[in-house]
């Protein structure tokens, strides 16, 4: 099976996207076809031995739409500086809307001004256009005022009738039929006007035809403008990569797209880092807020990794490029968000099914309502009014926009906070999670050993740490690196390098330092060497019971002291777990540590359950056991050995600093490596799902109530008959409300 993404053009409402899905799903070998109206994109899974891309494109084009294989954008490429096509289209719509509004207002004044009880004495019509004495002139004036409006709304007729002729009627078809019927009927009535017969002048409905188009155009313009805002997260990310980069060796400024991995770039203060890399020289603070959601600048020095698109704030950095093109962190983020916005949530399936039959059903209801009122004895003008109102008030757009707009805003909001969500389906499924399983190392803890206690047997802690760092400086062990790091942080000088360094596997090391024989290692090494450790033995046992690693240091057979190294708990872990509890979730800690050490960490952060002594390959088994017991599990981890467990869980969540394999296996990626983003992701899921439900409820209720009213239900019960103009206004408002509600989600504080 092969999965491809196609850009689809010519779609205007949910009926359009449903038509594209319907025709492509009928192709042999197509397993799945999902069309996202907002993203204007189709994701299709098919058997390449049974159908080709050319056949897929041909099928879509035959249905009246455009299709081309989606090309991955080169995010590292320079940003286009020309006019944004979307912005140009918005400007065109705005110009045409202004023209339509001016002529529609004039038409309303001419056609209906004399019907007002108080009249319009300030702007009287010349006698030449009097409805009573010069009926033909009165009718021709209305026609002349209506024609510019119809021209500005020409796309409704072009798209609507094209879709109708292709057998895929859409919202434009409804508007086009309704407006055209009013216009044609008015033209016929106009030609029936003679000097002797003026009665037909009362049957002119040019204003209905024109005002409906103007109001629907207003709704479309507002919808397009708001839809542009829903895509702002992607747009902002794509603008982060600078157009050019400065090569350190030659000092030349070159296009970012021409930079290769291994090149060294010079990044000046106040400029953006062009691509991912490692700092080879210099120190600075780097602002990564747009990429990770981290509000505070991050300190960078030699050896630090930097992300392309982040801002170098105050120092000069030399950066060796490690990733270019589609492999950069920024490109991966954009691809992640685009994929999420292009995929549908299961909750939208009902709306999609309704949208597929919506327009034909509305046309049938309009015809049926017209026939019933005609049989009831109403004149043609009344019947036409009902027919037009039903067509115009129906809004498949509200149904089609309900889910994708909320998902687009929700995933964009997540990306803004450093929370990447793989798909709309994950957004929906995440809301059902009731258990969060946390891997310990790198998730609850920092994942890097650090000195937690320095206990001298005599002398000072600084003196002990100085000797320990000097001895350990030649060792490659992670625990040794932690001790050296602690000494550097306290700005302690380690003095001379140790001599006669000897590694003692399973015990520690021996070295000569300033004429003294220094031992560094565990209890076994001290006992074998005859060093008395009784003064710190109980302390060592207590630290070991907490999951820490105590190391003894001795010189010439005398105990110098004890240094304990551990993987410290992240500062935010306890608060994050408390937030998960507030959301009603059960939190489980999964670790390979001993029971005593695991329970100590669990008590520190406040988890509900601890599962200790778990081998890496057993993590997925424990997740599956929880799932089998009826729990909906979110697994949170960062390492390669977490990938199977991430896949086994209902939702897999990878900490951003983790391995590429873990990130690829995950459904959600936390760019900040902050456990507090887990409850934020769950809240985002709940808010987005609530927004989708609100949108769908509004869309279904609007159509369920609006169509019967337009068909004359209120009139039959003694109430008023809905005008096509008000029907058009209501239809426009429904789409705007749906998009506006989705945009409201973007203002929420997670």
Stretch-by-stretch model annotation:
Residues 91-244, 353, 454:
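Transmembrane helix-loop-helix hairpins at the membrane interface
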Residues 81-103, 159-182, 334-366, 383, ...:
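Soluble-to-membrane junctions at the N-terminal ends of transmembrane alpha-helices
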Residues 81, 197, 210-269, 300, ...:
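Juxtamembrane coupling segments of multi-pass membrane pumps/enzymes
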Residues 95, 310, 434-476, 484, ...:
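ATP-driven catalytic headpiece of P-type ATPases
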Residues 29-50, 54, 204-206, 236-327, ...:
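Conserved cytosolic catalytic loops of P-type ATPases
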Residues 116-136, 165, 184, 413, ...:
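Membrane-embedded alpha-helical bundles of multi-pass transporters
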Residues 1-2, 18, 421, 433, ...:
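Conserved ATP-binding TGD loop and adjacent catalytic N/P-domain core of P-type ATPases
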Residues 1-139, 227, 331, 335-343, ...:
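Flexible metal-binding regulatory segments at protein termini and peripheral loops
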């Amino acid at each position: 099976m092969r999965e491809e993404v196609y850009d689809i053009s010519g779609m205007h409402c949910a009926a359009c996207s449903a038509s594209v899905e319907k025709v492509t799903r009928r192709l042999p070998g197509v397993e799945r076809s999902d069309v996202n109206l907002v993203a204007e994109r189709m994701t299709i899974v098919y058997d390449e031995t049974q159908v080709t891309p050319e056949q897929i494109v041909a099928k879509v084009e035959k249905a009246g739409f455009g299709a081309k294989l989606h090309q991955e954008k080169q995010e590292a490429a320079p940003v286009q500086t020309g006019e944004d096509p979307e912005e140009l289209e918005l400007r065109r719509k705005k110009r045409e809307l202004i023209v339509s509004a001016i002529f529609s207002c004039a038409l309303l004044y001419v056609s209906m001004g004399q019907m007002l009880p108080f009249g319009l004495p300030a702007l009287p019509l010349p006698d030449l256009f009097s409805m009573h004495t010069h009926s033909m002139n009165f009718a021709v004036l209305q026609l002349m005022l209506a024609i510019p409006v119809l021209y500005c709304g020409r796309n409704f007729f072009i798209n609507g009738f094209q879709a109708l002729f292709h057998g895929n009627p859409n919202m434009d078809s409804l508007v086009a039929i309704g407006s055209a019927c009013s216009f044609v009927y008015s033209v016929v009535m106009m030609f029936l006007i003679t000097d002797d017969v003026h009665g037909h002048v009362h049957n002119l409905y040019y204003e209905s035809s024109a005002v409906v188009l103007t109001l629907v155009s207003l709704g479309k313009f507002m919808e397009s403008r708001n839809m542009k805002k829903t895509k702002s997260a992607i747009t902002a990310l794509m603008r982060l990569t600078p157009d050019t980069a400065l090569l350190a060796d030659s000092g030349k400024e070159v296009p970012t797209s021409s930079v290769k991995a291994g090149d060294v770039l010079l990044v000046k203060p106040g400029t953006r880092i062009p691509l991912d890399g490692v700092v080879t020289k210099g120190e600075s603070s780097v602002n990564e807020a747009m990429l990770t959601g981290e509000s505070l600048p991050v300190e960078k020095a030699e050896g630090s990794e930097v992300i392309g698109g982040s801002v170098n704030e105050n120092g000069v950095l030399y950066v060796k490029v490690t990733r270019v093109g589609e492999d950069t962190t920024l490109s991966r983020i954009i691809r992640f968000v685009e994929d999420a916005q292009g995929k549908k949530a299961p909750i939208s399936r009902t709306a999609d099914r309704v949208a597929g039959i919506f327009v034909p059903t509305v046309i049938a209801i309009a015809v049926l309502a017209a026939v019933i009122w005609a049989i009831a004895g109403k004149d043609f003008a009344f019947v036409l009014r009902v027919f037009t109102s039903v067509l115009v008030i129906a809004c498949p757009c509200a149904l089609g926009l309900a889910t994708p707009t909320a998902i687009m805003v929700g995933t964009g909001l997540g990306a803004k906070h450093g929370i990447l969500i793989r798909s709309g389906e994950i957004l929906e499924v995440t809301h059902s999670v009731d258990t969060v399983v946390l891997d310990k190392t790198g998730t609850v803890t920092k994942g890097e050993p650090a000195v937690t206690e320095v206990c001298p047997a005599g002398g000072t802690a600084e003196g002990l740490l100085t000797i320990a760092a000097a001895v350990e400086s030649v060792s490659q062990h992670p625990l040794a690196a932690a001790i050296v790091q602690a000494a550097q942080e306290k700005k302690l000088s380690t003095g001379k390098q140790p001599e006669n360094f000897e590694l003692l596997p399973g015990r520690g090391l021996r070295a000569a330092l300033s004429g003294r024989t220094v031992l560094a290692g565990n209890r076994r090494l001290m006992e074998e060497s005859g060093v008395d450790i009784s003064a710190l033995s109980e302390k060592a046992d207590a630290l070991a019971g907490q999951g820490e690693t105590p190391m003894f240091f001795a010189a010439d057979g005398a105990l110098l002291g004890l240094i304990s190294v551990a993987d410290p708990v992240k500062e935010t872990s306890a608060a994050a777990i408390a937030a998960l509890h507030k959301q009603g979730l059960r939190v489980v800690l999964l670790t390979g540590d001993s029971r005593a050490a695991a329970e100590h960490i669990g008590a520190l952060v406040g988890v509900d359950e601890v599962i200790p002594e778990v081998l890496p390959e057993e993590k997925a088994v424990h997740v599956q056991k929880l799932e089998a017991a009826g729990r909906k599990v979110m697994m949170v981890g960062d390492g390669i050995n977490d990938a199977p467990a991430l896949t086994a869980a209902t939702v897999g969540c990878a900490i951003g600093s983790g391995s590429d394999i873990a990130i690829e296996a995950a459904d959600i990626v936390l760019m900040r490596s902050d456990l507090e983003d887990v409850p934020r992701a769950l809240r985002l899921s709940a808010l987005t799902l609530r927004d989708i439900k609100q949108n769908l409820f509004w869309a279904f209720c609007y159509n369920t109530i609006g169509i019967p009213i337009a068909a004359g239900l209120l009139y039959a019960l003694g109430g008023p008959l809905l005008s096509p103009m008000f029907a058009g206004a209501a239809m426009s408002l429904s789409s705007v409300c749906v998009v506006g509600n989705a945009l409201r989600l973007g203002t929420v504080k997670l």
